[in-house]
Amino acid sequence: MKSVRYLIGLFAFIACYYLLPISTRLLWQPDETRYAEISREMLASGDWIVPHLLGLRYFEKPIAGYWINSIGQWLFGANNFGVRAGVIFATLLTAALVTWFTLRLWRDKRLALLAAVIYLSLFIVYAIGTYAVLDPFIAFWLVAGMCSFWLAMQAQTWKGKSAGFLLLGITCGMGVMTKGFLALAVPVLSVLPWVATQKRWKDLFIYGWLAVISCVLTVLPWGLAIAQREPDFWHYFFWVEHIQRFAMDDAQHRAPFWYYLPVIIAGSLPWLGLLPGALYAGWKNRKHSATVYLLSWTIMPLLFFSVAKGKLPTYILSCFAPLAMLMAHYALLAAKNNPLALRINGWINIAFGVTGIIATFVVSPWGPMNTPVWQTFESYKVFCAWSIFSLWAFFGWYTLTNVEKTWSFAALCPLGLALLVGFSIPDRVMEGKHPQFFVEMTQESLQPSRYILTDSVGVAAGLAWSLQRDDIIMYRQTGELKYGLNYPDAKGRFVSGDEFANWLNQHRQEGIITLVLSVDRDEDINSLAIPPADAIDRQERLVLIQYRPK
């Protein structure tokens, strides 16, 4: 009966965190709108080989992540949940792997379930795992690779070892098809310390070629298909999206070596109090083969991405699966022997919740700021934000009431965040970051437009997805569409600021022309260097400018 109660609690936890509240959150630009529109266009066109965004070739990522996202929209429709269904599914599958692997290592069902709950409630996992980007997919394939390699190396027969390495190659191949060659580098770097300490080089060299073969065979069908359709895809993807993005001086998202330290700290909430002890206990017990393996999969990817010039918080998502397993193991030991770390964890959550309550007041309409984050008419959003932090502090306090038994309720600290964050986003943020909000406010003006132009790729993708049309034209800025716009068949999909007046004269009689621009909050739109418009509708950071036929 206790196992049944645990399972019911787990399903309720998943429903409250990963299912019920997802539709209440609008899509964020540029990431979610981009991936939503790529998958919508894939479904609309039936082209499952070459990714397109706004009808243009889009070679920043391979295809597998778009396949999963497209299946999500196909199953659940073109809505917020459908867009995020793929990443939620991948995150839950990763948690299932965490459960299975923990059970295999320690033969403890409670520990296995706890590891999954810790993983799913980690702030970084929840934030990225309910956000429509490709990182939850690559995290799943990397964790699957972690499990496959362990299976292969622990097998006692040549058949078992061969099957494990073949499975490892498939997971690496799917990782390559999701986000590129990093899916090869991370597993190699992660297993080397374990192989070295355990002196398992022989098995690696004898069977490792099977992983190489299965990886190549996994990628080969689509790799050949896109090479035939778009011969320059692999050149662009390898040199621009890998070498330039991560290693060269002009790499995207440049950040210092220590960038991931605050990411690890914030991402470990509401289990931050367990982080030092889990890592220290793992190092202290490094003679234990499984502990070394988990430590290696936690630390080595972190070091690899720290050395790379280009950095984003999402890159290290896979590190938190083995870390959650180490945390769960350490937490049970602490509960039995010395619950000091569990008490510290409770106080950290209380402090975080109280700090959030105070910060919410400071940026509210009743606080000291001249330009508050929320306006007076948004008072219900302020109370939602207060509720988020109040619940966080409450469950932090509850874990201290009988810490040896109640410490695991820290998993409920983010419950308010999960349920209420969609209702607490300030309008000033929604107007710039949620194109759906803008479309809802300007639907009647946008719908009959013959041409729509915008100066933001994220906004363009949001407009395209909301209006179910891929013919949005870029104005003044090309952004990440620069490469796709260079093709001859993309002519007419970009209009520069200097050319706009002439372009307008040529196309005005064809129907309503709508210009959607991103502007600064205090920018005077009358100073914009554009022809006089027939209608202007400003929604704070986004402004709709319309020209009608004369």
From Swiss-Prot:
It holds the Pfam family PMT. It is a multi-pass membrane protein. It is an enzyme of class 2 (transferase). Pathway: Lipopolysaccharide metabolism; 4-amino-4-deoxy-beta-L-arabinose-lipid A biosynthesis. GO terms for cellular component: plasma membrane. InterPro entries: ArnT_tfrase, Glyco_trans_39/83, LipidA_mod_glycosyltrf_83. It catalyses: 4-amino-4-deoxy-alpha-L-arabinopyranosyl di-trans,octa-cis-undecaprenyl phosphate + lipid IVA = lipid IIA + di-trans,octa-cis-undecaprenyl phosphate. HAMAP family: ArnT_transfer (MF_01165). This is Undecaprenyl phosphate-alpha-4-amino-4-deoxy-L-arabinose arabinosyl transferase. It comes from Escherichia coli (strain SMS-3-5 / SECEC). The lineage of its organism: Bacteria, Pseudomonadati, Pseudomonadota, Gammaproteobacteria, Enterobacterales.
